Amino acid sequence: MFFKGKKKDKEKEKSHGNIGNVISVENKTGSQSNLHVEQNLSNEDLKIQFSQLLYELGVPEAKRVEMELWSNDKKWMLLVQNKDKIKENEEKMKQKGSLYETPQFYLSLLRENASIQKTISDLKVSLASNKLSWIDSFIGLSGFDEILKIFQTFQLKPEKNSIDFLILFDCVNIIKSILNSQSGVKSVMTTSHTFKVLVLCLDQSYPPELRNAVLQLTAALTLLPTVGHSYVLEAIENFKVSNREKVRFQTIIEGAKSVSNTQLHYEYLTSFMNLVNSIVNSPADLQVRIGLRSEFTALKLIELISNSKGVSEDLDTQINLFFECMEEDNDEVGAHYKEVNIRSPSEVSTKIDTLLQSHPALHHHFISIIKGLYTLASTQSDLGGSMWNILDESVGLILKDPSKESQLEKLQNENNNLKLQLSEIKLNNSNNNNNNNNSNNNNNDSNVSTPNINTGSPLLPPQQYQDLEQKLQLTQNEKNESQNKVKQLESEIKGLNSTLTGLQLKVTKLEADLLSVSVTTPPSDTNGTTSPPIEAPSSPSLGAPPPPPPPPPAPPVSGGGPPPPPPPPPPSSGGGPPPPPPPPSSGGPPPPPPPPGGMKKPGAPAVPNLPPKKSSVPSVKMVGLQWKKVNNNVIENSIWMNVKDYNLNDQFKQLEELFQVKKPTATTPTAPVGGASNVAVGGGSGSKSIVSTPTISILDPKRSQAIMIMLSRFKISFPDLSKAITNLDESKLNLEDAKSLLKFVPSSEEIELLKEEDPSCFGKPEQFLWELSKINRISEKLECFIFKQKLSTQIEELTPDINALLKGSMETKNNKSFHQILEIVLSLGNFINGGTPRGDIYGFKLDSLSGLLDCRSPSDSKVTLMTWLIQFLENKHPSLLEFHQEFTAIDEAKRVSIQNLRSEVASLKKGLTLLTNEVEKSEGASKTILSGFVGKSTDAVTLIEKQFNTALESFNSTVQFYGEDVKTSSPEEFFQHVSKFKNEFKRTIESIQKERENVQKLAARKKAAASGPSVPSASGSSINIAPKSGVSPITPTSKSSISISQKPPQSTQPSISVQQQQQQHHGDDDDDIPQNGTFMDQLMSKMKGGEAIRASRRASQYVFTQNGAGGVGAIDALNAALKNKK
């Protein structure tokens, strides 16, 4: 369709092979049943239809010519067999319930370029909702290649409209769904082409929504083992060349700044920081991380993000992660220089001075370098500018130059060769002098002239030898001097490496501190003292009581001493800092602003109408529950406003014992070691028009042949066809006929050309177009006919989706049992996160429910908050265990696309408008037909539009009810969160019950084997499937199990394996957890909280241990690290 090559030829050959199979098999089995079908075509029509079939099947040119020589009977048999095959396949597809269920169907539509927007949109939904076997089948049929072709084709369009951008956006989501499959990840990792195509969409000419999706996906791709990071940097370098950037990352930074005044601001910044953290913090090499970080800071990244703290929890997580990793790298650099504090310029200067005293040869070079640095600093107002970045990169290249040692070795070998050559020349020179002396003596003794015979090289004058020797000596001196210079440079590099690295880190740190003081300084309190800025995890303890509410922010303080280094000192009223701001007005303290850095002081109210949350704080450090806070400005209109704090006081002790952080010093978890088309119509020897007189052909040969093939479906004359179109005669035209005719409506240019010629000399295609040109508003008539034929089918297809959306929304909003569970989870999470920035929140987003299964007990990784919750509900609220039975429509609702529904309804309204206009302008039979239909269609379209608006309003109301963002939420995502929790809840219950049954069976076997009398059930030794009321659901004295009875047998301690939960599938819920996992969805979800980047913080943990596994084992190891991350 878009590209031609060997793959397309192979597909044609494959199609040709399939034709051969059809012929060879069905000649034997199917011919008998088809022979009774009478051939009712003329030889010309048979030839045209057979030629059309060969084109549709993609038969190669050479084979096509051969097959066109077949007998008419053989051609007819193949046509009949093909029609039977088509009907059989259609029946099979109808029995399955939909024609849109197979990857082959989507690929055929993509290659035919038929309604590309709707096809891409439907494919996106199918890939997101089907099992991974469906995705693998799509990839196996070269579906990923087709998507990339479409993506690049629309990307290369010089002028793009909103539809083009929408197709690109859907393609990004399709690529993300494909990456959930192992085969999809392999397809992406084979080349950097996918990375380059995606990154090119970060240009500011693309909509922010599309760039945001690309940022999220690219950030996840960066963490792909072995090649992800290098491919992303390669793509960004390609983007730099394409956009003519001075430095890389420049346009990406500018893109983040450009959304500052949009509703997408904080979500876009979160995705942007996700990419920055993935690029900067995942490499294993410290110098690489420092260099990449300096590139971003040189482009004023810190200034960009410092103003955005305290608004979005996800964004705060990414910003804090950036500074945490920077602090870690600073500590690591400091550990490399134990003899000197690399962060102290004075100590570094003293150390350098000592080195200079012991190495006088370095003094001149060092002074020259320092002079240059001083000049650069004094002439540049921007100390984080590009010149410093270039200098830092140059020093890094010198330090990493692998050719330095080889150059020294080469110079040494060359020096040795010169010495050897010099010795040989000296020896030859001495021998030649002796020969000259002997020759002179012989000449003196006799007057006989004897020739001078030299068996070696010709003799040279002594003066020439001396000149050569001097040149060699000079060469050797220059060589020695060069070698000394190399040694001096090497010593200089070693001495200055620590200095330059330390200075770079110092500048970065000072910039961060300066901005933290000047931009994010909190307002002064009522005593006139200023609260210290909170930057990183190294903030002061939160144990002190909170200060009184601060007054409105004062103007930024100017002047004073240098910015304080982190961590900031406590507030002080002593001298040194600038004078405090004016005291607040007497009108009473206004509500305080959000604390900087996302750190929330315990007890501080968030908005004026909300009282402060006072959750209990655990007495020990707990494993945090990763959840997302609902913004306080939407609390009042959501369910969270009426949620009460559930009393879990009697459960605190058990929760602390199960979910407290282990006391031994935690080590960084390491990942386990493991294995890492359209077929062009025309050309060739296609069918030829058989006419008795010379004909005039004014059409393109390909268009002419395509018209001939299309006309083979009509068995009426052109005038009759024209009359059928004019009168909208359904007895002679059907829906497919109208669609075909609409494609060949003559253009105005073609009509003008036809008017200049004699109609009696027209060929068949020209005659056809000439007849169509006589019909007034032929395009409008055909479109009205198509709309009339499709209306009922479209409404039948839309109604189930609209009903599912409406019903799913009402179920989710009105499920009281689900509401009570959310109330319990809120209180549970606030206790677990007590005393941390994640505690004391009013509500959480629904996708946070998946964190219940991820939060494990450090003492026993088999125990999760989900299992604890179910045990607790069994004991206290058993009726809530059946909350999922009230959800009957969400599994259907999560497959609904509002965008598709809106597009289909808009299409119906457009068709209705066209129909109404045509009724006013048409005459005769067509007016009568359309007039009778317009009333019915108006009622039907109005009704379906009303139903859609009702369902949409219900969905938006439900989304708002749970504190979610109406503008960004979609049924695919919103209902997926609820459905996922429902299914995980059911599977966990089934797993617990199965475990109890196993314990019962084991106890029964032991009881039968025992020789003594049986113990009565009243003693409490029997095992109950449901605990009695008042029995604690958790027995904390056992570290290896979850208590499932009042007194379990001492010899067996049952446990619940999370792996078993994830592998067991029941009923219709299998599609929620595909067989091979959801790698990319899980990776992108973990990246939001920083877990994925922390898990891959040192890429060597899961990449360099694979021993050439090609990255597959590395992906498994990364996936395992994400699942086991606590």
From Swiss-Prot:
GO biological process assignments: 'de novo' actin filament nucleation; actin filament polymerization; cortical actin cytoskeleton organization; phagocytosis, engulfment
Q: Where is the composition biased (Pro residues)?
A: 543-597
Offer an example of a GO molecular function term for this protein: actin filament binding
What does a knockout show?
No visible phenotype. ForA and forB double null cells also show no phenotype.
Q: Which PROSITE patterns match?
A: DAD, FH2, GBD_FH3
By its UniProt entry, which SMART domains does this protein fall under? Drf_FH3, Drf_GBD, FH2
What keywords were assigned to this record? Actin-binding, Coiled coil
Q: Where is the FH2 domain?
A: 612-1011
Q: Which residues form a coiled coil?
A: 463-514, 980-1010
Q: What cellular component terms from Gene Ontology apply here?
A: actin cytoskeleton; macropinocytic cup; phagocytic cup base
Superkingdom assignment: Eukaryota
The DAD domain extends over 1071-1100
**Comp. bias (Low complexity):** 427-447, 598-607, 1009-1022, 1032-1064
Segments for region (Disordered): 1-21, 427-462, 518-619, 1004-1078
List residues of the GBD/FH3 domain.
38-406
- Compositionally biased tracts (Polar residues): 448-462, 518-532
Q: Where is the FH1 domain?
A: 527-611
Question: Can you quote the domain comment?
Answer: The DAD domain regulates activation via by an autoinhibitory interaction with the GBD/FH3 domain. This autoinhibition is released upon competitive binding of an activated GTPase. The release of DAD allows the FH2 domain to then nucleate and elongate nonbranched actin filaments.
Subunit comment: Interacts (via GBD/FH3 domain) with activated Rho-GTPases. Interacts with pfyA and pfyB.
Task: Give the protein family.
Answer: Belongs to the formin homology family. Diaphanous subfamily.
- What function is annotated for this protein? Formins play an important role in the nucleation of actin and the formation of linear actin filaments.
Q: Which protein is depicted?
A: Formin-B
- What organism is recorded for this protein? Dictyostelium discoideum
